[in-house]
Amino acid sequence: MDAAIRGNDVIFVLKTIGVPSACRQNEDPRFVEAFKCDELKRYIDNNPECTLFESLRDEEAYSIVRIFMDVDLDACLDEIDYLTAIQDFIIEVSNCVARFAFTECGAIHENVIKSMRSNFSLTKSTNRDKTSFHIIFLDTYTTMDTLIAMKRTLLELSRSSENPLTRSIDTAVYRRKTTLRVVGTRKNPNCDTIHVMQPPHDNIEDYLFTYVDMNNNSYYFSLQRRLEDLVPDKLWEPGFISFEDAIKRVSKIFINSIINFNDLDENNFTTVPLVIDYVTPCALCKKRSHKHPHQLSLENGAIRIYKTGNPHSCKVKIVPLDGNKLFNIAQRILDTNSVLLTERGDYIVWINNSWKFNSEEPLITKLILSIRHQLPKEYSSELLCPRKRKTVEANIRDMLVDSVETDTYPDKLPFKNGVLDLVDGMFYSGDDAKKYTCTVSTGFKFDDTKFVEDSPEMEELMNIINDIQPLTDENKKNRELYEKTLSSCLCGATKGCLTFFFGETATGKSTTKRLLKSAIGDLFVETGQTILTDVLDKGPNPFIANMHLKRSVFCSELPDFACSGSKKIRSDNIKKLTEPCVIGRPCFSNKINNRNHATIIIDTNYKPVFDRIDNALMRRIAVVRFRTHFSQPSGREAAENNDAYDKVKLLDEGLDGKIQNNRYRFAFLYLLVKWYKKYHVPIMKLYPTPEEIPDFAFYLKIGTLLVSSSVKHIPLMTDLSKKGYILYDNVVTLPLTTFQQKISKYFNSRLFGHDIESFINRHKKFANVSDEYLQYIFIEDISSP
């Protein structure tokens, strides 16, 4: 290596984002400046609000840089998770870079790993809502061309890794005229978050990727040769389209005429520079003209148009030839719309009459094999080679750019072999079902021969349901809510309230749960009490993450709230669980947004207790009571004398086994669809029943007793003053002691003392140190003469 490029201590910086190219090239002092390292440090200290972005001054003349990475994770990892993730991150990226350097640059694999792992600096962002840092490998040098060539390799690593830091590598920084924010400076004047240094590195030069100081511990590698410099032994293959047609395609791309067009032939078109008559700007990049000519190369059965000199100063254009069979195979498979990219970055594949995720098994490869016989004969033979299948799969992934919205059909129930329309009862299969893009399903096949009303299973099931929730006048409202709640589990839309299944032990709650799980399969998930009692935030929460797109979530066995130490149900959680999007991510994942389609059912033997009660909470709670007890013969007499039960039935010991064997799967599914049509067509409706919650009694009643005072009540002050009201700051108010006397007429202080005190503390105001009042008026005081 030339000694002239073994050192660089002049740092070129941009003073803002988006500096015009002309100002950058002319080094306009308003926009750019060059510093020595000590000068740069002083400038930052003297201008703490400055915005500086490090960049190469002239990439064509000098492009030696340190290997660097920008990581930006939209979540805050705790210290233990961060330390584990950063260790794995260093190992993963060093292995990846070493493999690339060995393959493309002829570097020594072990030397690259040693230089990267032994010396690097790490910044830390002051933004506490995310994990963001720059990492500079201080003794590992390369060229900007090499980093740009490495971009795709790092992108594949970030997509395949399970490490959240590796998945958050910003590969967009590997480009021409790239910039990296200088440590200690802001992104823009209004942003007060910065990247700070971390020990043991406290010199600013340790955080600059363009600073070069090679020593005995340094290691340098670069690309051995450019791909466009490689000329194949045999240029034009028999399977290609004619050379004349191919070169006409090239001519149409340029728009401007190619002066030496007639000089090109099959043997020299890769070596003869194209002489363009720039009557209009370049059709590829819109620049007025180019100093260096364009040239053609032949790679992977396609003509590649690139510019000599700096090839990145103009766009590279690929002209596919019909002879590129693997590219055409990928295009043909994409044209069938059998592979799609979801909003969350997952690939889904239409195979065996249903949409499936590509994450757990190589479904794209299976799709390629299954579609092989539908392709022309000259294509199908290519797919017998595993290496070529991998190439086709890579082409498909690269060609999929636009994501699609999925699971937007709330009235469709997906199965392994098709989709059931809940409104008209039609079952769609094959291509008819393909248009309903759903990424989750029941996980079993629909069988229309079992999906009938008249069957022995249906007769048995109706007896079970009628035992659990009797069809009596006293239980009519409860039975209706039971049917509404269970049938809403078929609907793929956000539900407005949560339902508590409340009753003593052995009253049919768990039997209902098992029947529902059997009927909707993988669309059902059972979770713990933590979704109700723990704070819901951006941190790892597999319970919430597992709710994504599920249609029924069953939360079983709430604690006895009378026990000391038991957590109350968080009112905020109830509100969040009725929103379309619930925040919570799986461990080591950036996917924090979960679409909430679930009917959330809480199975409890104990009266629910909430940390805070308000109108918003009461609008979101429904209660189904279970009062039929299923007893063994030995306990029947005691159960019949228990006031908690309306009826006592003998326990069927074999029922659980029948449910687990899915005996009632399609019978119950038929019943759910029937109830769905009865209650939820055309609009899905679930109504709360706050009157069923004892803790809500005070708040429901007090809303009928009080109104907030306002200016319209001032004319009534003559009569109101006789009833204890006073006028304070032009507002009718009620002294605290008077309020307590009046409220005691409606509520027993022994039963509702805590609720009354809580209401007063929330709404009372102070006239002075000793006088307290409330800005409320009793309705009877303004309605009575």
Curated annotation (Swiss-Prot):
GO cellular component, one term: host cell cytoplasm
SF3 helicase domain ranges (all copies): 477-639
Record key words, sorted: ATP-binding, Helicase, Host cytoplasm, Hydrolase, Nucleotide-binding
E.C. numbers: 3.6.4.-
Localization: Host cytoplasm
Binding site for ATP: G503, E504, T505, A506, T507, G508, K509, S510
Active-site feature positions: D170
A GO term for molecular function: ATP binding
InterPro entries referenced in this protein's UniProt entry, alphabetically: DNA_primase/NTPase_C (IPR004968), Helicase_SF3_DNA-vir (IPR014015), P-loop_NTPase (IPR027417), Phage/plasmid_primase_P4_C (IPR014818), Viral_Helicase-Primase_Cplx (IPR051620)
Region (Primase): 342-469
Pfam families hit by this protein: D5_N, Pox_D5
Enzyme class: hydrolase
Chief place of localization: host cell
Subunit structure comment from the entry: Homomultimer; hexamer. Interacts with OPG148.
Family note: Belongs to the orthopoxvirus OPG117 family.
Function: Multifunctional protein required for genome uncoating and replication. Major viral uncoating protein that is required for the release of the viral genome from incoming viral cores containing the viral DNA genome. Possesses an ATPase activity that is required for hexamerization and uncoating.
Protein name: Uncoating factor OPG117
The organism of origin for this protein: Vaccinia virus (strain Copenhagen) (VACV)
Top-level taxonomy: Viruses, Varidnaviria, Bamfordvirae, Nucleocytoviricota, Pokkesviricetes
